[in-house]
Amino acid sequence: MASSIDSHMTESTADSESESFSLTDDEIINSILDILARTAPEIRNGLPGRRVKTNEENPSGESPMEADVFADELLRNRLGSLDGIGEYASEERSSADDTGSGLSVCIDPLDGSSNLKSNAAMGTIAAVYDAPLPARGSDLVAAAYVLYGATTTMIAAVEGNVADYVIYQDGSYEPIEQEVRVPSEPTVYGFGGRVPNWPRDFNSFVSDIESDTSMKLRYGGAMVGDVNQVLTYGGIFGYPALTNAPSGKLRVQFEGYPIGYIIECAGGASSDGSQSLLAVESNDIHDRTPVYVGTPSLVERLEGALAGKADSE
């Protein structure tokens, strides 16, 4: 039977010579992950009746879907009431909510919510910082994302370890892989943004990737789904700086830091084009950054291409 993350991380398996896998002994982090997992079926069940836009405007100047607001409020209520959480911030809120004292949590409640209409994959991203917001990448103590795909799963990263969980309809869950690693041989790629707005050096890099017959395009319009392809099969995902958006589209605190942390904990690499995503400076919770993550050899090639090196392979 499935049980809580805390029990999966700490209990001994009676019929096994080895102890069960443990991400952390920190009870607060375990509780955060537990809430994310147990809330996932409620978010998923709430999607069908919330597939239209609201009349509101979020900090990005966009009209969120009703599902975005629903997921945000649900997670705010659950996480904000947890002892040991000092701040709750989300992409849908202009500023962080003061919830007491302790860790800071940044949430992208429904990454890829534009996929609701086409019924494609989407997810929830969480970053946990041991510092006030806006935090630094070095302040991360845990990160996770829930993927609402054919099944509901959660990738969780803590202390250099990454585990994959399947989440059942009743909110229970169990690990399906306890030491997730980015495959060393890349096979998939996916890049966001309109092609006419790609910088020339990035466009050239993409052309080189596309000419490799061993590589397959996997892009679905929700970063968590595309990143999960890379985490599963090896490869590269990127949302570049654009000619009309030099800082890119994705947000440092909600997407860049946590996804970079997860991929690096799994043995992959992350970059903003010249350095690790975890080294990016952020002075506002809604700061943006270009995002590139994946197999280290490809991320290194990308950085070389963006630096104008003639031979980045």
UniProtKB/Swiss-Prot annotation:
Cofactors required: Mg(2+)
Protein name, per record: Fructose-1,6-bisphosphatase class 1
Pathway assignment: Carbohydrate biosynthesis; gluconeogenesis
The protein's Enzyme Commission number: 3.1.3.11
Residues annotated to bind substrate: D111, G112, S113, S114, Y219, K249
Keyword field: Carbohydrate metabolism, Cytoplasm, Hydrolase, Magnesium, Metal-binding
UniProt GO cellular component terms: cytoplasm
Subcellular location: Cytoplasm
Family matches, as InterPro entries: FBPase_C_dom, FBPase_class-1, FBPase_N, SBPase
GO biological process, one term: sucrose biosynthetic process
Lineage: Archaea, Methanobacteriati, Methanobacteriota, Stenosarchaea group, Halobacteria
Annotated region (Disordered), positions in chain: 1-23
Subunit structure: Homotetramer.
UniProt cross-references to Pfam families, sorted A to Z: FBPase, FBPase_C
Gene Ontology molecular-function annotations: fructose 1,6-bisphosphate 1-phosphatase activity; magnesium ion binding
Gene: fbp
Polar residues bias locations: 1-13
Organism expressing this protein natively: Haloquadratum walsbyi (strain DSM 16790 / HBSQ001)
Residues the entry annotates as binding Mg(2+) 2: D108, D111, E255
Record text on cofactor binding: Binds 2 magnesium ions per subunit.
Domain of life: Archaea
Family: Belongs to the FBPase class 1 family.
Keyword Nucleus: no
Compositional bias ranges of the Acidic residues kind: 14-23
Positions of Mg(2+) 1 binding: E91, D108, L110
Major localization class: cytoplasm
Catalysed reactions, semicolon-separated: beta-D-fructose 1,6-bisphosphate + H2O = beta-D-fructose 6-phosphate + phosphate
